[in-house]
């Protein structure tokens, strides 16, 4: 199987038309040159004074051709090609987990910010979107809080669309692939005159997927989505420019194809009657009695204004973002009918940013700015306790009541037997047998417990305000100092309304009672946070555009409130009350109880101090670019996503006291053979460990996670790509004058590798280092390109995500497998 798939890649390189020539000799006059992306794809930056590789930070950039070569359809597929960056493909479009430099989050406050055409994407549930019509992607590593505010502690990603002022015409792209991948994209760019230009684009994408739900045979990762966007650029004068944009996307998919992760020890210990008997160790196929699914509408709109003054630029960006989604999740991930969740989100976000930047040739380059945003988010998230869960709860409370009665009766009987001369051991055994017989004779003990769905309505408004300044001062012709400071204020609140109802049917000693237990929680909580986010850097410029730098900065992620764990709180509370209930009971909650709830659901802001040194080197007369950086981060109150409470009905954010992250990053980009060969290698080493973090466990004990690796963070990332263009001799063509004659063929391969990744705080479950190989061959027919591509050429088996759950009363580990071998073809037409 491996040889046959490797053969596909070799055929891509070998199956070239006659007359193709490739001169592999390196001539003395090789004209190869690697350019900074700022020199090729020019974007007006409203805040920065210098190009990316001239700033005191580590960064990675991709142009449109590089994104096409890597076949990037969303930002998750840049994982490993950016050092220390991982955004795993799992769950659904709802999932937006990004990990960079040892920090990240599966829920609530993100660690990496995203901007699209200068507009911030502020809704976490909208981070994972279809990428198309993109001309450039920048990834800035490390805290970017001074200029970009909270939730950019790990870094920042900026995406830029093609400008209709620079690019005109119509593009149509059609793709087919295994797993019945199908996709159509169409874009039109038109420059009406020197002052006005616009673009329109739309897409449809779908895939039947690779995994089936063993419960019903349905496709567990089916997806269909479509969308459209438009952009209008208007420059009424030489000083004033307007940029209006809107982007809508709709997604409907089956999601969360998690299968049980089974170890070799579990299989070896399984009896022949166990469902584990005879299985192969590893992650099994999904087997859920309900097919989890997700639907989402997102609309992002922005209005940018730029005024060019005498020696300064003023930029304004106003945005409105809308989210409306629906999620059904089988949260026990089992074929049994225990639990499921239905969640609906309805959100609106308004934001405004105003910045003023110097534009002159002086030694002082300055930026001032202010940012404000307000988010309204309403979430309805009822949790349904299904028949197997109610059966489990009924057995639990029945066993509790039966054993309590049995032990009480047996103690009294045993005392009499011991007084009559019987040994203690014999008396206790005889007493328990006699007590059990008496219980059975008088009607026994049986309690049926039915827990109604737990509704939950949560409103979580958020207000954020920031004011900032950054100066870059040329101390000498070679040395520049960077000084920045931001004041950031955030106000967070939660209004929650939730309740629980448990109906009991108690049959004890022939007496039947039917108590009903209810509990209601309704409260408003709020908090606010202030932070100063400084930045200090030094950049020393070397010849040929190279430089070395050092920087010190502070990172910040906002605090807030959990709400996914209320069903766990209410279930625990009502189950405890049910053990003593003899009549209807409405559980009362006093002020002290609500204060304890507030402490339970809140999580604190995360802060970090980042120390970094690095260099940007232009080597071999700009045939090679080498970027190196080393960093150390001291993290306080690191935010972690864990499963809630006793049963793990939802994910919650908690804080680890202290942790640290350190690492190395390297990126090498080069060109050779008169730019016919382009290659890139990136590597990231991350060591992220807890310094202070303890957690309570059942029975009142604690567990210490000191020196454990922070979960979900890959210790190594490795990305590599190489593309070789083979030009076609026109003399070898039948009709070289044809508009569609073959110009060149580009063959390439790429590799993305990550690991080791721990999936839990105790570091008991992990994914070893793995590598995924890709290949492509692109034929250039002028207006038409045909690209044959392969992903996961060697069909590597790996997990992209794993989670532990005790929703069924026993702790299991569930994981999602990475996509297997996939073959596809793209047709791109420009006219």
Regions found by a protein language model. Name each.
Residues 377, 556, 676, 740, ...:
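C-terminal beta-signal and adjacent terminal beta-strands/loops
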Residues 59, 76-119:
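Extracytoplasmic beta-strand/coil segments of soluble accessory domains associated
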